[in-house]
């Protein structure tokens, strides 16, 4: 029996799974955020050990021989980060012949398109887009929270705080976001700011669901925030269309687009190119498992027949 390891590390959590050659799940475990840029190599090494130990506990105390392993990380498009990830994996899995680490978009391209051409769009804590054409990958957006202003949970949460502050100090119109945020944060919006600065991206991204709630109540500011962010993601897909000669498949992933029908509806309404964004059918961690299987030469036909179940 051949086994494959996949790891999906995002801005909120890290998911690891071990599957056999038929796609049956042998073990699965969760850990904290796994963006190597944010947590650093030492913390990621400790996290990797925690994940592999958690998997081993579910397989009799030790991992079976692993034919191939792939770790897809938020921030893994940086060649040095990808190299660090591979080294850490190889150190922990010295007998595994095929080990690779890279961008979490590679996991989604594998799990959503099985190595075929198309586009993947992520909107989670952060956001990113990649077009794959004739084996070549082209990045659109996804340059990090300092340089990409719209599209992810952090952006939506930050925009909500900004709208609430404008309502609070009189620069903006009243918005339901102000009382919703104050209730969530447990204090006035001004008093909440030091804590938000300390807690950073993940805490701010966690406020994004309040924007969807306010938009459902008819709040104009909240609806405007969602439109601005989904319009930016639509622009990314329209930019990706330049790499294709006609229609192309698009797979979407990440908490914003996977959990919110409103977000996906708005996105589809703004897209001008010939593509129909569809949610990824499997969890991203199984996309990482598929990426590992592709390393080992498993065919697209076999992969499409797997449902990754217990």
Regions found by a protein language model. Give the residues of each.
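Glycine-rich phosphate-binding loop of actin/hexokinase-like ATP-binding domains
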Residues: 116-167, 171
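ATP-binding/phosphotransfer module of carbohydrate and carboxylate kinases, centering on a glycine-rich
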Residues: 1-64, 91-92, 112-119, 162-310
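Structural signal for short hydrophobic segments within the conserved structured cores
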Residues: 27-30, 100, 138
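Short beta-strand-loop/turn "lid" adjacent to the catalytic site in phosphate-handling enzymes
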Residues: 53-93, 98-100, 112-113
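Glycine-rich beta-strand-to-loop/alpha-helix junction loops that act as flexible
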Residues: 70-77, 123-125, 248-259
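Short, active-site-adjacent cap segments at secondary-structure transitions
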Residues: 78-79, 107-109, 128-129, 257-260
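Active-site glycine-centered loops adjacent to acidic/histidine catalytic or metal-binding residues
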Residues: 8, 104, 124
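Conserved phosphate-binding catalytic cores of ATP/NTP-utilizing and phosphoryl-transfer enzymes
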Residues: 1, 97-120, 136
């Amino acid at each position: 029996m051949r086994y494959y390891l996949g790891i999906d590390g995002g801005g909120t959590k890290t998911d690891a799974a071990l599957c056999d050659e038929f796609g049956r799940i042998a073990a699965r475990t969760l850990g904290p955020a796994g963006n190597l840029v944010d947590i650093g190599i030492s913390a990621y090494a400790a996290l990797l050990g925690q994940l592999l130990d958690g998997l081993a506990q579910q397989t009799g105390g030790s991992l079976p021989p692993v034919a191939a392993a792939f770790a897809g990380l938020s921030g893994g498009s940086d060649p040095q980060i990808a190299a660090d990830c591979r080294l850490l994996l190889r150190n922990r899995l010295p007998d595994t012949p095929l080990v690779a680490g890279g961008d979490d978009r590679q996991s989604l391209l594998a799990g959503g398109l099985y190595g075929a051409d198309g586009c993947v769009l992520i909107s989670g804590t952060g956001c990113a887009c990649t077009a794959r054409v004739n084996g070549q990958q082209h990045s659109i957006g996804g340059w990090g929270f300092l340089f990409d202003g719209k599209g992810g949970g952090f952006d939506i949460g930050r925009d909500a705080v900004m709208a609430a502050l404008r309502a609070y100090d009189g620069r903006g119109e009243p918005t339901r976001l102000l009382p919703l945020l104050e209730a969530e944060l447990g204090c006035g919006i001004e008093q909440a700011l030091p804590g938000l600065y300390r807690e950073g991206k993940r805490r701010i991204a966690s406020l994004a669901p309040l924007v969807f709630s306010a938009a459902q109540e008819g709040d104009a500011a909240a609806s405007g925030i969602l439109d601005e962010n989904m319009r930016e993601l639509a622009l990314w897909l329209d930019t990706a269309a330049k790499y294709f000669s006609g229609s192309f498949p698009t797979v979407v992933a990440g908490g914003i687009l996977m959990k919110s029908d409103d977000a996906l509806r708005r996105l589809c309404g703004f897209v001008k190119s010939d593509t129909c964004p569809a949610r990824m059918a499997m969890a991203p961690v199984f996309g990482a498992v598929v990426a590992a299987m592709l390393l080992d030469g498993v065919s697209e036909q076999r992969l499409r027949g797997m449902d990754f179940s217990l």
